[in-house]
């Protein structure tokens, strides 16, 4: 949430409004998002990010992004949200320290070790729990809060009623996706990409196999035919813009 000054019934008051966070795959898109009103932008670096299919940001790009964003009173969140394997540990500490030195406002993380390391290093930046951890209830949110995180990004599977109920019970910052892909396998807990294309979804290689078109068979009989729309496991995107006033 962010505080803004508004005139209501002839009086100037401070009200809280949700922060509008947008993704960006390169510097041009980042600048457009901020100039058109985004309060913050989340981006992926060359390492430790699930956004590996995007062009992504070098450390020099991230520094330029931070300088541009801060000039326009916006924030930069960097995704460090892969699930770490042993060969991903090398260079992680140095990378986090560099992001902090550059002035990044927050990192978005999914692996518990990155949460722990960020706190151990006493970084100035915030630590946000990624939607990849499928957080859906108050007890889980309090667990992460006790670990010292600053924000929890809800699982996209949470419906409006649960979102409203949880918001009333916890004080920590909450973030929720209102537009974009709806992962059919609970926020990336999926092995389809590994199986079909040998690309690890939880290390940034998701080939979006759930969006491919499939023919359905029962034994030798095809259940969908050419005149029917091909079957896809994830054919819809989220679109909650009309729900924002709530």
List the model feature ranges, each with a label.
Residues 151:
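Conserved glycine-bearing catalytic or ligand-binding loops at nucleotide- and phosphate-handling centers
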């Amino acid at each position: 949430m962010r505080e803004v000054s508004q005139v209501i019934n002839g009086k100037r008051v401070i009200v809280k409004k949700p922060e509008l966070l947008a993704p960006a795959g390169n510097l041009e898109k980042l600048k457009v998002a901020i100039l058109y009103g985004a309060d913050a932008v989340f981006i992926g670096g060359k390492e430790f990010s699930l956004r590996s299919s995007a062009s992504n940001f070098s450390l020099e790009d991230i520094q330029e992004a931070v300088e541009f964003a801060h000039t326009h009173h916006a924030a930069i969140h960097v995704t460090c949200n892969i699930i770490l394997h042993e060969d991903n540990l090398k260079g992680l500490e140095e990378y986090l320290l560099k992001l902090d030195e550059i002035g990044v406002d927050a990192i978005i993380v999914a692996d518990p070790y990155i949460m722990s390391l960020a706190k151990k290093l006493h970084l100035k930046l915030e630590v946000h729990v990624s939607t990849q951890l499928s957080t859906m209830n108050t007890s889980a949110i309090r667990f992460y809060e006790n670990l010292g995180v600053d924000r929890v990004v809800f699982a996209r599977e949470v419906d409006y009623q649960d979102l409203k109920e949880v918001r009333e019970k916890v004080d920590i910052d909450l973030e929720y996706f209102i537009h974009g892909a709806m992962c059919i396998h609970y926020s990336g807990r999926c092995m389809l990409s590994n199986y079909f294309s040998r690309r690890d979804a939880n290390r940034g290689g998701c080939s979006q196999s759930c969006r491919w078109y499939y023919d359905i068979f029962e034994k030798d009989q095809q259940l969908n035919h050419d005149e029917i729309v091909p079957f896809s496991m994830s054919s819809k995107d989220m679109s909650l813009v009309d729900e924002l006033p709530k």
